[in-house]
A protein has these predicted regions:
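A conserved, positively charged/aromatic
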Residues: 93-106, 119
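N-terminal beta-loop-helix "entrance" segment that forms/cooperates
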Residues: 41-54, 256-257
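Short N-terminal targeting/anchoring amphipathic segment
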Residues: 51-66
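Catalytic binding pocket for nucleotide-activated donors in carbohydrate/polymer assembly enzymes
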Residues: 4-11, 17-30, 34-39, 98-99, ...
Length: 383
């Protein structure tokens, strides 16, 4: 088995790091990989030579279907194309509409399987493959960790974000705002469910083709609900006297008055974020809107020896046990989160036990290398 893996660009090269670990998984299972990195100024020439020359390959692999974004390049693909999505499919609508055969897609949320089948029926194979995590060789012992609570992630002010909709024509603005507001309370609904509900209330019927376009056009809703809960969680902690070290872009827009407790730092590189996790007792996670999926931050937190405290997803509840390998909190009961955090800060040995169990479980089952092995097994099975 031979494959071509294309490494694109991303903020802090984070996707490149994930891909390099996935490649190790491919190679462990005996697959020969030709890697083409966009960081190489001659990457297009190398790609063209590989696709049109005598190099024999069985599949092409990349993250988020990036190569499908080239208008003509995909027409030269001679074998199966595998796109590993790390976001909701609506962010990659135009790429997913390409008609290459065979076209394989993996997704990080089980809800997205039904979404892809419904709106992109031309896709040949679809599989749920969750994120993985990355650890370090050396991490600090739990009792010696200097950071009590760590939060990593960017910030957008949800109030200001919603004000942006005032520029939008009235009917569409009401649809967007009403969908955002229903997701604030229906925390287990997907964006698609909420939007379909609002369309039904307006007696508007959409074809699947129209709906996939609308979802792609209204990613604002997904961005808003992520921003809303990120703000709510951090604000609630500050108001209740929980000290949090926050790293990420945009937090200068946070208008809370809890500067004694919410300590805002500049954004850091991905590798620096791993070092911070290795110095933290608790790493707080607010899931992207993946109701049956995963996020790499959960696994990476565990692999770096911190206690992961995260809101729930159906998948995470399937693979981890609450208060054994991680600690869940509920978006509907964010007011209980300060007490939950304080409970584990006060019980150092209990927190350490959960952190170690999570580390062991994630290192065994949830590395990016492991995902590479799972992916290759699937590609071979479907050949």
């Amino acid at each position: 088995m031979r494959g071509i893996v294309f490494i694109g660009t991303s903020q802090y090269d984070v996707l490149g790091l994930f891909l390099k670990e996935i490649i190790k998984g491919f190679e462990i299972n005996g697959c020969e990989i030709l890697t083409i990195d966009r960081a190489n100024e001659n990457y297009m020439d190398l790609l063209a030579q590989a696709l049109t020359g005598e190099y024999e390959y069985d599949f092409i692999f990349d993250i988020n279907g990036i190569l499908m974004g080239h208008d003509r390049l995909y027409t030269f693909f001679k074998q199966k194309y595998v796109a590993f999505l790390v976001d909701h499919p609506m962010y990659h609508h135009k790429r997913l509409m390409r008609q290459h055969k065979p076209y394989y897609v993996t997704t990080i949320d089980k809800d997205h399987i039904d979404y892809l089948k419904k709106y992109y029926p031309h896709l040949d194979r679809i599989k749920f493959v969750p994120h993985g995590g990355i650890g370090q060789d050396r991490i600090e012992e739990y009792k010696n960790r200097k950071i009590d609570v760590l939060f990593l992630g960017s910030y957008e002010n949800p109030k200001k974000k919603l004000e942006y909709t005032e520029r939008i024509p009235n009917g569409m603005r009401e649809l967007i705002v009403d969908t955002c507001k229903i997701l604030e309370t229906k925390t287990q609904w997907t964006m698609e469910q909420a939007l379909l509900y609002q369309l039904e209330m307006r007696q508007l019927k959409m074809t699947n083709s129209d709906m996939s376009e609308i979802m792609s056009d209204l990613v604002f809703i997904d961005e808003y609900i992520r921003a809303y809960y990120r703000d709510k969680v951090i604000r609630t902690l500050g108001e209740n006297g929980v000290t949090v070290e926050v790293y990420g872009n945009g937090w200068e827009e946070f208008d809370g008055n809890q500067t004694d407790f919410i300590h805002i730092h500049e954004s850091v590189s991905y590798m620096e974020s791993l070092e911070l996790m290795g110095q933290a007792k608790i790493v707080l996670n607010v899931m992207p809107w993946f109701k049956k999926g995963s996020h790499e931050r959960v696994f990476t937190t565990m692999m770096n020896g911190a206690l992961c405290m995260t809101d729930r997803s159906e998948y995470l509840e399937e693979v981890f046990t609450d208060k054994k390998e991680l600690v869940f909190y509920d978006l509907k009961e964010v007011e209980k989160l300060p007490g939950l955090i304080q409970e584990y800060l006060n019980q150092n040995e209990k927190a350490k036990e959960i952190a170690l169990a999570g580390k062991e479980k994630s290192e065994a089952d949830h590395t990016w290398k492991k995902r590479g092995q799972e992916l290759l097994d699937w590609i071979v099975e479907e050949s």
